Amino acid sequence: MPFTYNVVTGASADRLEKLIAERLGPGADKVAIDRRIWRLFGEKWAVLYTDLSGFSRNVADFGIVHFLQTIYESHRLLVPLIERDNGILLKTEGDSLLVMFRHVSDALRCAVEMQKCTQQYNETRIDEEKVLLCVGIGYGELLRIGDSDIFGAEVNAACKLGEDTAKAHEILITGEVSRTARLPPGSSLQALDTAPAGADSAFRLVYK
């Protein structure tokens, strides 16, 4: 099973570029154009963003081959879970994955399964080979540009939670996720002191 992904832009990106160019023109009705853009590309999705704790430090200490090994292993572990839980892997960036789910409950379930899978994997690995996963999840209206990219406040919030806020083994979610989703069995929420830009609140998912 391959774990390398190539995403090609197409008609959606071309259409968006034309609308943006029109929006930049003199006398453009920006409100009307914005409505057209949202009508064409606006969709509601759950967004899951993963990051690996301590990854950059390990690359500096152990070299590029270690980098490639860790990336490969994380994909090998996580991609089958994404597919099983009805996710769409939109893109990979270094040690991070950007994943979309139609249903928030699928995103939460997948996040818990990811954490349990990597923790089990780590039990038999030396420290520098462990996959220390951080996860952020958002949910809401976003602009989906074909299969090339997504934009929106909840996208930004999910990325901030996963990359900048979450520690190893943590799953952090936005307030919108907490209001929308049914939590996995046996789990609970702990409010965070601060929320990323684009979210009104944020929580730590305490899972079993």
Cite the ranges covered by each PLM segment.
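Short beta-strand
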Residues: I88-T92, D127, T194
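Short, solvent-exposed loop/turn segments at secondary-structure junctions
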Residues: V99-M100, L142-G146, T180-A181
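Short loop/turn motifs enriched for small/polar and acidic residues
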Residues: D95, G136-G140, T174-S178
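Catalytic cores and conserved motifs of cyclic dinucleotide signaling enzymes
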Residues: I145-D149, H169-I171
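Intrinsically disordered, glycine/charged-rich C-terminal tails and inter-domain linkers
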Residues: M1-D34, A168-K208
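Catalytic NTP-binding/metal-coordinating core of nucleotidyl cyclase/transferase enzymes
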Residues: S12, L24, K30-R109
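Alpha-helical scaffold within the catalytic cores of cyclic-nucleotide enzymes
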Residues: T9-A13, E17, Q69-N86, L98-V135, ...
